[in-house]
A protein has these predicted regions:
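Internal, active-site/partner-interface "lid" segment
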Residues: 1-43
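Electropositive nucleic-acid-contacting surfaces
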Residues: 29-77
Length: 168
């Protein structure tokens, strides 16, 4: 199940089990690779089932946490003519935005956070016609990525201007 997550293999297992097992193992082992190896060498069907159940609970918690944070801290902005939903967060993935992102209203999602030197920013989209890698390069020439997911950096001054105007 762990390897299916690493390569986004949706065919061999039920994807909800893959995600739940992944989160259950993260909760059990953290990021300790040696512990993961040791645990998996002893794992049996009951252990796998327990990890899936634990992972389901963790995922439910994350969904509720994201929903609350999006409700309190997200805002809409204009990004080079596209409608975006934005939030200051350390959770850099599109699932953070699931409770508020509406493809009928929004073209992209933009998480951002301060890392002590600059603002780290990402763009995500579900729309085929939007190329967020081009938008990331437009925001900062060093930015880029894939058509549906990209990143870039902003200075304090540029971020403050964006936050004041809600436009980029």
């Amino acid at each position: 199940l762990l390897s299916a997550y690493d390569v986004w293999d949706h065919d061999r297992f039920e994807w909800s089990d893959v995600l739940s097992f992944q989160y259950g193992m993260r909760g059990y082992c953290g990021l300790d690779v040696d512990m993961v190896r040791e645990v998996l060498n002893k794992a049996n069907g009951e252990f796998v089932s327990d990890m899936i159940r634990n992972g389901e609970a963790i995922i439910e918690y994350i969904i509720e946490k994201n929903r609350g944070e999006m409700k309190m801290f997200s805002f809409e902005a204009d990004i080079f003519g596209y409608k975006a939903i934005c939030m200051n967060t350390t959770e850099f993935n599109s699932t953070t935005f699931e409770s508020m992102y509406d493809p009928r209203k929004h073209d992209l999602m933009m998480p951002f956070c301060w890392n002590g030197r600059f603002f780290r920013c990402s763009f995500y989209t579900t729309k085929e016609e939007v190329d967020v890698s081009a938008l990331a390069r437009k925001a900062n020439p060093g930015g880029g990525g894939h058509k549906a997911a990209a990143g870039f950096q902003l200075s304090v001054e540029d971020m403050m201007e964006f936050l004041k105007s809600k436009e980029m």
